[in-house]
Structure formats: structure tokens, C-alpha cells
Amino acid sequence: MIKKRIIPCLDVKDGRVVKGIQFKGLRDIGNPVDFALYYNEQGADELVFLDISRTEAGHDLVLDVISETAEKLFIPLTVGGGISTIDDISQLLNHGADKVSLNSSALKNPSFIKEASEKFGRQCICIAIDSNYDSELNDYFCYTHGGKQRTDKRVYDWVQEVEALGAGELLITSMTHDGMKQGFDVSHLHEIEKLVNIPVIASGGGGNPEHFVDLFKETNVSAGLAASILHDKETTVNQIKSSMKRGGIPVR
């Protein structure tokens, strides 16, 4: 059985780690390099670094922070936030990123996924999807610009399109569950992972180690992303993995 991954996520704004609830009310909680070092020592399987200041305002790539973060890591680093050109990807990979995460730019220009995948390899391209439920239409839709703008793209269509275009991995954030710490949107995630043959990372809702056990028992996703509960030291990567082991879930 494939071993499941636990991936801390750093939302970085103006060079500082921030966290909010349902994409709002961001608070400064520290230095990304310190967090990266802590999670590396904790036994995290990977780290995701999302530069949300670039997503919001089109700032230059924070290459110095990414380089410093990557230097401290012995685990894969995925970087996302406002990546819109092949040159952006080249610079990030050259400064220590192992993978890049594309969101708004991919929805705006789907051929960018194909171009990036062909140049750098499918394994480098992760497509991040901010998914929100529309109760009137009884469906999930993709959001862009840090969860601020809704698109007409159905999530269940988009995941299949990006796989066909060359995406190597999906990062699905359930906006209704983000920061709520009440468990993952397992029914939605289960529908997604049935539609694709590439790894799916689940994000949004992990509030305690048992939520990760439930996630991996009720879906076939490859990894669980965590932010709030790890940053606030409500639990640790090791504690999550210990609960998973007790639940019979293979961990790295």
C-alpha cells in the first residue's frame, strides 16, 4: 500500500507566515524559514509554500526567502502563488523549489499547464484548486485570486482537464472547511480522486490527528495538508502520523 504523506503549508504574505479562516482575517504568525526548519525536524514529508502577497498584488517572486527556506530542507518543497510564466517556474526551480503550484494562471490559460509540463516534466507541476460549493446549483466551482473570484469552471470538470494537459498532482482546498478544524470534506475529495489517476492532496479542515485518519480511511487521496493546527502547535506531524499508524494507515 502506498504510504500517505503529511504536508505542512506555509501561507506567506510579505515574507511572513500568516493564517486565517476561510481565506479571511489573516494574522502574522512568524518567519517561514523558522517554520520550515521546525517541520523538517518534525518528520514532515513535504512542505508547501504559498506566496499569497504575490497572488493578491503581483509582487516579484520572493526568491531570497524561497532560497533560504529550501536550504534548510531535506524534503521536497512546492512553491505557489502568482506563477504565470515559464520564466517564473525556471527561477523557482533554480532557487530550490522541487515543484510549483499553479492556480489562477492555469484557469486563465490552460495551455500553460501543457507548456510547463512539457518543459519541466509532469512531476514538477501541481495544480491547486480552491473549491467552493454553490448550494443553488448544487455543484462545486473553482475560485481564483486567493479564493476571492469565482469562475464558471466546475471542479469535477477541471480536475480531469488538468490531468489531460499534463498536471502531475492536484492540491484541493475546500474553502468552506478551510481553517475550521472540523474535518476534511471527504465526500467531495472522494469524488475527485475517483475521476483522476494522479495524486490528490487534501487541504482544508484538518483539526486534529483523527481527522487525518478519517481522511485516509474514507478516501484514496495521497496526502493531507495542515496549517493552523501545526502552526499553533495544537498537534505535531509526529502525533498525526502516530494516530495514522494506530489506525492502520501506512506512513513514511
Curated annotation (Swiss-Prot):
* The organism's place on the tree of life at top rank: Bacteria
Q: Which HAMAP family match?
A: HisF
The record's note on quaternary structure and interaction partners says:
Heterodimer of HisH and HisF.
Query: What GO biological process terms does the UniProt entry carry, in alphabetical order?
Result: L-histidine biosynthetic process
Keywords from the named record: Amino-acid biosynthesis, Cytoplasm, Histidine biosynthesis, Lyase
What is this enzyme's catalytic activity, as reactions? 5-[(5-phospho-1-deoxy-D-ribulos-1-ylimino)methylamino]-1-(5-phospho-beta-D-ribosyl)imidazole-4-carboxamide + L-glutamine = D-erythro-1-(imidazol-4-yl)glycerol 3-phosphate + 5-amino-1-(5-phospho-beta-D-ribosyl)imidazole-4-carboxamide + L-glutamate + H(+)
Described function: IGPS catalyzes the conversion of PRFAR and glutamine to IGP, AICAR and glutamate. The HisF subunit catalyzes the cyclization activity that produces IGP and AICAR from PRFAR using the ammonia provided by the HisH subunit.
Principal localization reads: cytoplasm
Compartments reported by the entry:
Cytoplasm
InterPro entries for this protein: Aldolase_TIM (IPR013785), His_biosynth (IPR006062), HisF (IPR004651), IGPS_HisA/HisF (IPR050064), RibuloseP-bd_barrel (IPR011060)
Q: What is this protein called?
A: Imidazole glycerol phosphate synthase subunit HisF
One cellular component GO annotation, for this chain's record?
cytoplasm
Tell me which PANTHER family the record gives: IMIDAZOLE GLYCEROL PHOSPHATE SYNTHASE HISHF, IMIDAZOLE GLYCEROL PHOSPHATE SYNTHASE SUBUNIT HISF/H IGP SYNTHASE SUBUNIT HISF/H
Question: Which GO molecular function annotation, any one, does this entry have?
Answer: imidazoleglycerol-phosphate synthase activity
Q: Under which EC number(s) is this enzyme classified? A: 4.3.2.10
Could you confirm whether the keyword Amino-acid biosynthesis appears in this record? yes
Write down the top EC class of this protein. lyase
List the Pfam families: His_biosynth
Positions of the catalytic residues: 11, 130
Source organism per entry reads: Staphylococcus saprophyticus subsp. saprophyticus (strain ATCC 15305 / DSM 20229 / NCIMB 8711 / NCTC 7292 / S-41)
- Assigned protein family: Belongs to the HisA/HisF family.
Could you tell me which pathway this protein works in?
A: Amino-acid biosynthesis; L-histidine biosynthesis; L-histidine from 5-phospho-alpha-D-ribose 1-diphosphate: step 5/9
